[in-house]
Amino acid sequence: ANFTGVIAKAVDAGYRLIIVLTGTVELLRSQTQRRLDMELVGRENILGGIDPRDGDLIADVDYAGSDDVDWLAGRFVSHGDLAAAGAPAIRRLTRAEDDYKLLRAGLDALDPRAGHELREPGKPVWHPDNIHRTDVRIAVVKKNKTVLTKLVRDLRRIKALLNEIPALIIDDEADQASVNTLNPKRATEDRSRTAINKLIAELLGHLDRGQYVGYTATPFANVFVSPEDAEDIFPRDFIISLSAPPEYRGGRAYHDFEELTAAERSDPAVSNERAFVRDLMASDDADPDEVDAELLRALDSFVLSGAIKLWRASVDPGLSGAFRHHTMLVHESVSQKAHADLALRIGRLWKRAGYGSPRANGRLRELFEGDFKAVTAARQWEPGLPRAGSFDDVAPFIGEVLDLVLNSNGDPVVVINGDKEQQYRKVDFQRERVWRILVGGTKLSRGFTLEGLTTTYFKRRAMQADSLMQMGRWFGYRPGYCDLVRLFMARGIKGRGRQVYDLYEAFGAIMKDEEDFRAQLEVFSQVQEDGAPAVRPIDVPPLVFQQLPWLRPTSRTKMYNAELDYCGVGGRLQDFPRQPERGDGSVNIKHFGLVRPWFEDRRFGAVEEFEYRDARTGRINSFRGRVAIISANEMRRVLGGFRWVEGFDFRPTLRMIDRAGAEGKLEDWAVLLPELSGSAEKIVDGIRIPMLKRTRRDGTRGGFSGSSFRQRDAIEAITGRRDAPGGGAARAYDTGRRGAMLLIFAADPKPGEERSPKLLPEEMTAADTATIFSLALPYA
């Protein structure tokens, strides 16, 4: 919808050639073509003057000739009389099922001069006397070498000079195929650019009046492009992070980014993991029967959630549209052979499940009472959402679920992997209801919208964060059924040696990385009074974060320009929990010794009350804590003494602190020591401190869990961030040149020993105490 709006504004501004680059498969291109035809091109331009009552001619018209549901329902935009409205006609150079083809003799379809559209042929196309009479050309094109070569070739053959045509190139999935993946240090001269990157660069080179706008959900690859490469596609002028509407279910909807107590972790009212995530622990190597049992539980969830949807629609008919589709995604491999085998396995399990029998109903009743009923009752998911009181309410709808799933050929499974084009017709969400189980890989992991996705069975490991993010198809809008979503996630995939991968943890890490990245992009979104960007990315390329050592932000081939010098975002709290393993406790002793003088010298003041906004309820709450003011030089010495896990580099942060100090933007630090209800006072080597519980992460990630959201607002308010509701006490510490540190101490005994502070002895040693901090630089 956003880039449809951008195109509409571009047309109003006089752009007359619109090229939309989609993903690399036809399925994605046709989806985008349809969306633009429906929202922008409109009925009149699609009909092209054909009388919709002329049955012979209308048969060849997209949508109208195929009795498309949305076309018949009037959902395609209508512009009325274009000439009377003074609006340009839109010529479609591509169709619903046809990518770009060489125009040959029909070049006037692309050429305003050959089409005799110019009022003043002696003046350029862009001249005001001509531009408003000129038709708009729009091509929705796959990022495919053959297709793009045809388009470039036709553009070079038209009569109009390319530098006189105002053009807009919209690149959807801009991190895919567009980025040059050949390292210039290694590539031979004749292969210095990848084919798609070269063709896009050639397009931009020909279209002097062309503008390039890229869209992507995973922008990591794009910011690794070299800013100095004049022909590459670096986002040099602006980067805008589009805010998701409240109804969108993103990473935070399914993960617990804040530290939770043991009781909170088991409560679906508080914990998103408890509400939505179901662990997959079995492997075919060790126990194939248990793998079948886990997969059967996922199938049961799919059937039961479908029955609940149908029951809700019977109670509230307004929900029927939201439940037109109901799908389950199964994703565990990129191999087409594996997809076929998995589809057969699911088919066998479906038959063995015996849906509709008393035995199956007994399983579904247990699942409803033990899972779905509790999760639905735990929160106010949506206003007025019908809630089934018992399994008996939804049981009568199970038969209808089976009819919908098996309505075509009796097979509940569809494989989508590019092997057979006819498979796609079985999931044509526009033409018919789709209640199916979808098995696939790349075709389902990038761009293709899975309507009604409710149950996900996910076991595929990827080594790049952007690839893994694209597989997260459960993010999106779930009207009327957000409480029914279930993610069956592999929690113990074996890697090389003793390496074990937790996919849920991996998704959580990249979602947190993305949040940090988006927070940084806010800097690049700001504009000056004249509309110019306050900061251009080409001047300060944005940083990409990486929490998991094994999960790179993007492919190595897209990262050859990556080199981090310094990093830091003013007014944003950043956690630094990546400390080494406890070992013999010597690192803990060293870290505690660095901050010990602050307590010995009684630098912390009296207890004060700070505020925060609870992200779950929106209410303003408070906590207590004490503050110490530490000079910039002393803090620099303390921070320089901390040790980190292998692979984590703290030096860019130190260089940013040095730079802020040298520029006079950082004079001192306010160190906030929270005193929370969950803490317990302990005496550590003679120093009395509040001790908290923090979870030690496993070896693949290292360090501790992050800070709580409860202290974030106060820290950011101290640094001068005006929209952080930290309370009057926090704002009183703001000087405009003050950084803030959140300092906590966590029990860190030997593995297997008690970690709960309230159960530990009053006197402890520094070896059993972790010193953990988070930082925020001055906002100004």
Regions found by a protein language model. Give the residues of each.
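C-terminal catalytic or substrate-handling cores of phosphate/nucleotide-
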Residues: 142, 283-320, 326, 333-337, ...
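Conserved segment of the helicase C-terminal RecA-like domain
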Residues: 476-507
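Conserved P-loop NTPase catalytic core
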Residues: 44-73, 77-85, 165-171, 175, ...
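C-terminal accessory/interaction regions of large nucleic acid-associated machines
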Residues: 462-482, 612-780
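A short beta-strand element within the Helicase C-terminal
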Residues: 436-439, 446-460, 485-486
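Conserved C-terminal RecA-like helicase domain
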Residues: 45-123, 154-161, 165-186, 191, ...
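Walker A/P-loop NTP-binding motif
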Residues: 2-15, 26, 35
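Conserved RecA-like ASCE P-loop NTPase motor core of nucleic-acid helicases/translocases
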Residues: 16-24, 326-333
